[in-house]
């Protein structure tokens, strides 16, 4: 089986600003304790997207816990709903599934169910690999972004809460956020123009800053009709359509 790319979606995909459509604002203060596990769901909705530069898609799947020889034939995002995925098991792990591909020089994994991208972030990022992890967090907002490299989380923040940051270099992306009119030059105060634009537009600015910094892109079709190989990364999901 060969690894899938974003062929058919345009050479550079669709950027990543559109991922704001599956995230959202958080009504309170900073995300407690920094990054947390994403909130999977039972209906095939996306629990996160992992981008990795420096490894092919199959190796990304392996680092996320998959048997690299056990990928399915390419399936669409809608086909995920036909797999037997038990998201939650009392006292045990739920099932985690990913679909993997490559776009713009980055491998990507789209996460479903009880996936592993958050807890294995530093493992994915070892040996010089760069990783950007986006989690929409629909049940526990804000949506979260983390950047890791060489086995360490360098920086992370919530969309709309960029002034609260974590990681070994929490201010790494501040110049990019300032240039995108997300934050004022002090790196703390939100730009008035971003606040007045509404949450969706403000989140697009943040994702646009990350997109430009790292050259990230993901075709919209990857969440829908684009067919990509799928892997089990946790639990015992049924990988044959029901």
Predicted regions and their residues:
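Long, compositionally biased intrinsically disordered terminal regions
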Residues: 13-16, 22, 141, 146-242
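Hydrophobic alpha-helical segments that drive targeting, anchoring, or assembly
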Residues: 8-182
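Elongated, non-catalytic scaffold/linker segments and compositionally distinctive motifs
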Residues: 1-4
């Amino acid at each position: 089986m060969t690894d899938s790319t974003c062929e058919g979606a345009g050479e550079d995909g669709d950027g990543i600003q559109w991922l704001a459509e599956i995230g959202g604002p958080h009504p309170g203060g900073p995300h407690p304790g920094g990054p947390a596990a994403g909130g999977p769901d039972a209906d095939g909705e996306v629990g996160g997207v992992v981008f990795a530069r420096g490894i092919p898609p199959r190796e990304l799947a392996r680092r996320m816990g998959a048997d690299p020889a056990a990928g399915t034939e390419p399936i669409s995002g809608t086909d995920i709903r036909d797999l037997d995925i038990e998201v939650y098991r009392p006292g045990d792990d739920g099932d985690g599934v990913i679909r993997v591909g490559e776009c713009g020089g980055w491998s990507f994994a789209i996460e479903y169910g009880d996936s592993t991208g958050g807890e294995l972030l530093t493992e994915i990022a070892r040996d010089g690999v760069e990783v950007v992890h986006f989690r929409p967090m629909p049940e526990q907002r804000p949506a979260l972004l983390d950047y890791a490299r060489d086995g360490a989380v360098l920086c992370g923040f919530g969309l709309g809460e960029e002034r609260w940051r974590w990681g070994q270099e929490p201010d790494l992306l501040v110049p990019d956020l300032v240039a995108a009119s997300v934050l004022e030059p002090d790196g703390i105060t939100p730009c008035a123009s971003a606040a007045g634009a509404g949450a969706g537009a403000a989140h697009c600015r943040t994702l646009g800053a990350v997109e430009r910094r790292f050259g990230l892109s993901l075709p919209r079709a990857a969440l829908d009709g684009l067919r990509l190989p799928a892997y089990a990364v946790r639990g015992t999901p049924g990988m044959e359509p029901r």
